C-alpha cells in the first residue's frame, strides 16, 4: 500500500465520520450505531458549517495524485468525489434543506423505524435510543419551521402534509407494537414521548397550512441540475434531451415488438 493510498483511506474515513455525524439517521440505516440517540443538527448554522467542511474535503480529495493509486483506490477516490460534489450541489445550489418539508417528515419516520428492526441489538437498547429520538422530534420540527423559505414549492408542502398522516399512523401502530415486548417502564416512556411527537406534528401541520400560501417555488430541478446529475452522479454521457430521445426510441421499439 502506497503512502498516497494510505492518505486516501484515512481521508475517506475522516469524511465518513463527518457524514455520519451530520446525518445520524443515515448512519443508523447503514448499521452504524454511534449516533442512534440523536437526530442531528439541522439548523442553518449547521448546514453552513457542513458546506464549509465538505468544500475542504473536496479540495483535499482533488489534491490526491491518482496516478499513484491502484485500480480499487482510484474507484474509491472517484466515488468519494461524486459523493462530496453531489452533497455540495444539494446543499448549495438546490438548498434542499430550505425547501423540502416532506423530506424532513420522512426523515423522522426513518429515524424511528430504523431503530425497531432486528439487527442484533437488544430490544431494550433499541428502545432507549428510540426514546431519545422521540424526545428530540419536537425541537427538530421547530428547527424545520425556521429553515423553510418561500423557495419551497406548494407541491412539496402538500407532500409534507400527506407524509404527516403516514407518520401519525406509524406512531400510533408501529411503536406500541414494538413496545409490547418491553418492560412496563420503557413502554410508558415510549408512549409519553410518542404523544409529544404527535402533538408536535399537529403544530407542524398547522404551520404548513399557513405556510402554503407563502411557498412560491418550483418543484422542478431544472435542466442544468438534471444534466449535472446525469453526468457526475450517474456517470452517463447523455444530457436530458438525449435521455428523453433514448427513452422514446426504446418505447417505440417495445411497442413495435408487441
Where are these regions (language model features)?
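N-terminal maturation segment of proteins
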Residues: 1-258
Amino acid at each position: 500500500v502506497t503512502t498516497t493510498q494510505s492518505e486516501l483511506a484515512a481521508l475517506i474515513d475522516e469524511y465518513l465520520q463527518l457524514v455520519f455525524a451530520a446525518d445520524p439517521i443515515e448512519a443508523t440505516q447503514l448499521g452504524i450505531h454511534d449516533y442512534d440517540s440523536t437526530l442531528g443538527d439541522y439548523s442553518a448554522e449547521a448546514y453552513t458549517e457542513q458546506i464549509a467542511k465538505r468544500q475542504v474535503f473536496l479540495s483535499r480529495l482533488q489534491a490526491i495524485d491518482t496516478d499513484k493509486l491502484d485500480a480499487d483506490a482510484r474507484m474509491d477516490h472517484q466515488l468519494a468525489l461524486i459523493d462530496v460534489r453531489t452533497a455540495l450541489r444539494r446543499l448549495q445550489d438546490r438548498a434542499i434543506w430550505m425547501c423540502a418539508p416532506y423530506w424532513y417528515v420522512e426523515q423522522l419516520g426513518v429515524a424511528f423505524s430504523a431503530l425497531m428492526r432486528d439487527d442484533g441489538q437488544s430490544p431494550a437498547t433499541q428502545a432507549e435510543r428510540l426514546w431519545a429520538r422521540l424526545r428530540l422530534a419536537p425541537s427538530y420540527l421547530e428547527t424545520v419551521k425556521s429553515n423553510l423559505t418561500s423557495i419551497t414549492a406548494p407541491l412539496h408542502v402538500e407532500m409534507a402534509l400527506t407524509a404527516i398522516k403516514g407518520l401519525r399512523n406509524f406512531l400510533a401502530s408501529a411503536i406500541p407494537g414494538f413496545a409490547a415486548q418491553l418492560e412496563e417502564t420503557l413502554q410508558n416512556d415510549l408512549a409519553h414521548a410518542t404523544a409529544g411527537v404527535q402533538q408536535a406534528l399537529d403544530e407542524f401541520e398547522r404551520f404548513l397550512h399557513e405556510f402554503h400560501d407563502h411557498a412560491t417555488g418550483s418543484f422542478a430541478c431544472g435542466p442544468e441540475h438534471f444534466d449535472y446529475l446525469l453526468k457526475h452522479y450517474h456517470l452517463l454521457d447523455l444530457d436530458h434531451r438525449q435521455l428523453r430521445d433514448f427513452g422514446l426510441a426504446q418505447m417505440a421499439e417495445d411497442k413495435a415488438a408487441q
